[in-house]
Amino acid sequence: MVRGDMVLLGVVRAPHGVMGLVKVRTFTEDPSHISAYGPLTDGHNCFNVTVVSVLGADSVIAKFDGLSSRTESEKLRGKRLYVSRSSLPRLQEDEFYENELIGMDAKLEDGTAYGVISAILNFGSCDIIELSTSTGKVVMVPFSRSTFPVVDVERRVVIVVPPEVIGVGSR
């Protein structure tokens, strides 16, 4: 079981070759850093991971200690890989881990419930917050101080000021 202080760093996609290597989708800013914070866990087992090569902005080929065949690495397919939050670098004041934001309540400046953060996306220029609104619509809003002036991690709530294009009436 994964504890509440664990942060998701990656997911094993598939075996790579016949020597026990695997493709891993990473959620770290630099994909090669998935192995930089110590052993990873799926909640049951610990894995010492070495990055063999970086495949792109969010994927690596990795070696898990103790795996030497495709058959062994196949068993890791779909495993979610976590690390203790205390192993990660301290964040700056306006930085957040993605898993902290997902599921947070979003309220308007007057306190009216607006929705819940359902996803964080990035299409190149900035992070986009996907909000599932209280009316059932899905709205995408740029993650900036002007649209999210308050992010309260402890209370699990954000204040959202929807851009004029979206408008409050689109709730």
Swiss-Prot record:
One cellular component term (GO) for this entry is: cytoplasm
UniProt cross-references to InterPro entries, sorted A to Z? PRC_barrel-like_sf, PRC_RimM, RimM, RimM_N, RimM_N_sf, Transl_B-barrel_sf
The cellular location(s) given in this protein's UniProt record come to: Cytoplasm
Q: Which GO terms describe its biological process?
A: ribosomal small subunit biogenesis; rRNA processing
Pfam families per the record? PRC_RimM, RimM
Q: Where is the signal peptide?
A: none
Per the similarity annotation, which family is this? Belongs to the RimM family.
Please identify the protein, giving its name as recorded. Answer: Ribosome maturation factor RimM
Q: Which organism is it from?
A: Anaplasma marginale (strain St. Maries)
Gene name linked to the record: rimM
